[in-house]
Structure formats: structure tokens, C-alpha cells
């Protein structure tokens, strides 16, 4: 633990916690502080100008990151007939109906995303207590309950990320890996922020994108100067 503590302390010493850095410098600091042996994810936290306690200000959605996430995603699909065949052709790893539901009930959750055709919700609805706590429950707001299951599979495989504001009014998302070029990370961040702006609640007043910070899996957060994002 001592080595970890020293590394964290050294990383923090490189960064002024109250300073807002241009995006290029912020990413450089984050990558420089990411010293884990694995390819750490690069994450972003966005403080929104909303009241997360109000039901009409819950920000939720999804976006396909143009440069992907750097992660291989396993997709399960509830569909039948032509839609099941289309899902398989699109690259779904598991496709089924009652048989897939039984796998879920048995605890076989070897997938990262669950997609469902609307006509299968009578089955999927019974799995809420299992899928819900794991963030796997299909939802039309994030495009995982849809008649076009094939496109949803393609989106998931292409690097779609889901986002939902937490109780503190913050969105947390992954925008890539340490190994990504800065241009890829910036394009992914831009796509995420664009999706957040489009999802802005009508009742939200004042500054909407209040603060943005980037970090690596094992690293510290670096605040981003928003003006540099449009430069």
C-alpha cells in the first residue's frame, strides 16, 4: 500500500486542484499520471446545472463515441423471428427469449449490454430485480428498447455509452483509454458533451455545463477549461 500512496501523492503534486487546464494540457497530465500496468480508461465527470432531486431534471441518454471506447462489448438481445436473425447478423453475442431469461435468472450474466425488442418486454420486465441493480435493464431512453435491434447492436459494438446523472448532479462516463490519441479522446468528449446539451431539461436554468474534469482509472481528476474545448 505504501507504494500506491506514494504514487498517488506524487500524482497529486503535479496538479493544481483548483486550476482549470486547457484540454490538451489536461489530457497530458492525466496520461502522465496514469502509471498502472494496464491500459487505464480515461473518464470524464461533468457537473450539470440541474436539481437532480427533481424528476423532470433527470438527465439520461446514450451516445455513440466516434472513436469507440477501446473496450470489447458483449451484447445480449431479447428478440424472436426476423429480429432475432437481424440481431445475430449485426454481431449480437447472445440472442433469445425465455431461454435467455432463464440464463439471467440462473446468474449467467456474461454480457455488458442488454437490448430488447418492445414485444419482448413481457419477459424482460420480470428480470428487473436482476438486471436493474447492475445497470443492464433495457430502457427506451437510452435506445436499448427498440424495434431496430440490429442497429442497437451495431451502436453498442461501435462504442455507445450510456449516461445518467447521479444524485449530486454529475454525469460520469468513459471516453476512451490511455492508449488513445488525444484527437480521439477529444472527439469522444465533444460527442458526449453534445449529447448532454441535447438532453438538457427544459426546466434547467442558468449555466448548464458547470464543470468538467478528466481522470484515469487510478489517477486524480484534472479540471478542464471549457473555452479550450471549442478552440
UniProtKB/Swiss-Prot annotation:
SUPFAM superfamilies: Ribosomal protein L1. The keyword Cell membrane does not apply. Keywords: Repressor, Ribonucleoprotein, Ribosomal protein, RNA-binding, rRNA-binding, Translation regulation, tRNA-binding. It comes from the Bacteria. It holds the Pfam family Ribosomal_L1. One of its GO terms (cellular component) is cytosolic large ribosomal subunit. InterPro entries: Ribosom_uL1_bac-type, Ribosomal_uL1, Ribosomal_uL1-like, Ribosomal_uL1/biogenesis, Ribosomal_uL1_3-a/b-sand, Ribosomal_uL1_CS. Gene3D superfamilies: 3.30.190.20, 3.40.50.790. GO terms for biological process: regulation of translation; translation. GO terms for molecular function: rRNA binding; structural constituent of ribosome; tRNA binding. Binds directly to 23S rRNA. The L1 stalk is quite mobile in the ribosome, and is involved in E site tRNA release. Part of the 50S ribosomal subunit. Belongs to the universal ribosomal protein uL1 family. This is Large ribosomal subunit protein uL1. It comes from Cupriavidus pinatubonensis (strain JMP 134 / LMG 1197) (Cupriavidus necator (strain JMP 134)).
Amino acid at each position: 500500500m505504501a507504494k500506491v500512496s506514494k504514487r498517488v501523492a506524487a500524482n497529486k503534486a503535479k496538479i493544481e486542484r483548483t486550476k482549470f487546464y486547457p484540454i490538451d494540457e489536461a489530457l497530458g497530465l492525466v496520461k502522465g499520471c496514469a502509471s498502472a500496468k494496464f491500459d487505464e480508461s480515461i473518464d470524464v465527470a461533468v457537473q450539470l446545472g440541474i436539481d437532480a432531486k427533481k424528476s423532470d431534471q433527470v438527465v439520461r441518454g446514450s451516445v455513440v463515441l466516434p472513436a469507440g471506447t477501446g473496450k470489447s462489448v458483449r451484447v445480449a438481445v431479447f428478440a424472436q423471428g426476423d429480429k432475432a436473425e437481424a440481431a445475430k447478423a449485426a454481431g449480437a453475442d447472445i440472442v433469445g427469449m425465455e431461454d435467455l431469461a432463464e440464463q439471467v435468472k440462473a446468474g449467467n450474466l456474461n454480457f455488458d449490454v442488454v437490448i430488447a425488442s418492445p414485444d419482448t418486454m413481457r419477459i424482460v420486465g420480470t428480470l428487473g430485480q436482476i438486471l436493474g441493480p447492475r445497470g443492464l435493464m433495457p430502457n427506451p431512453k437510452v435506445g436499448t428498447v427498440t424495434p431496430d435491434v440490429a442497429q442497437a447492436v451495431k451502436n453498442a459494438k461501435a462504442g455507445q455509452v450510456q449516461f445518467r446523472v447521479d444524485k449530486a448532479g454529475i454525469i460520469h462516463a468513459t471516453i476512451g483509454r490511455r492508449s488513445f490519441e488525444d484527437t480521439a479522446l477529444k472527439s469522444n468528449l465533444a460527442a458526449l458533451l453534445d449529447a448532454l446539451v441535447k438532453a438538457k431539461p427544459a426546466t434547467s436554468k442558468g449555466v448548464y455545463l458547470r464543470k468538467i474534469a478528466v481522470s484515469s482509472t487510478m489517477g486524480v481528476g484534472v479540471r478542464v477549461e471549457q473555452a479550450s474545448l471549442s478552440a
